[in-house]
Amino acid sequence: MNTAHPIRNPEDLEQFKGYYQYQKPHPRNYLLIILGLNTALRISDILNLRWEHVYDFQMGRYRNHISIIEQKTGKKTSILLNQNIVRALSWYQQSLSGSNKNIQPQDFLFCHKNENVPISRVQAFRLIKKAAERCQISGTISCHSLRKTFGYHAWQQ
């Protein structure tokens, strides 16, 4: 098994973040990458996020924090939803509204088109790997690279 690498080069990182936003627009995939890069959550925790974790349906607005219990550690975690995440969420939500998808609080954020089941870790890996390859980013890039990239750039600052 290859060890995942962070995306160290800032230009590569910007190109990677923009792949599903500009080169091949796909709001769901863009949100997955932005969430991973901005929260450092494990992919298992990201894929299990539901709309109720990020959106307050009673108030009609995005939450300030994601509060979850991490699958691996069992710890309760609260993570800030920064502007990059909120913009990605908004774009994704608008794309779903345009397709007449009625979002429910219990719906998974990253679900298949016609089912309320989360995409698999393998599918998440494929879309991350594809973006890295198309952006010609060297090194072993995987789902864990999002978490490592967060740590690397936080440490650099």
Predicted regions and their residues:
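Short, flexible active-site-proximal loops enriched in glycine and acidic residues
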Residues: 98-106
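C-terminal catalytic core of Y-nucleophile DNA break-rejoin enzymes
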Residues: 5, 71-90, 106-129
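Conserved tyrosine-mediated DNA breakage-rejoining catalytic core shared by Y-recombinases
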Residues: 48-85
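Basic, Lys/Arg- and aromatic-enriched nucleic-acid-binding interface segment
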Residues: 10-39, 43
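N-terminal export signals and maturation junctions of secreted/periplasmic proteins
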Residues: 1-10
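Short, basic (Lys/Arg/His-rich) helix/loop patches that form interaction surfaces
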Residues: 20-25, 126-157
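Short, Lys/Arg-enriched N-terminal segment that forms or immediately precedes the first helix
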Residues: 12-20, 111-112, 133-136
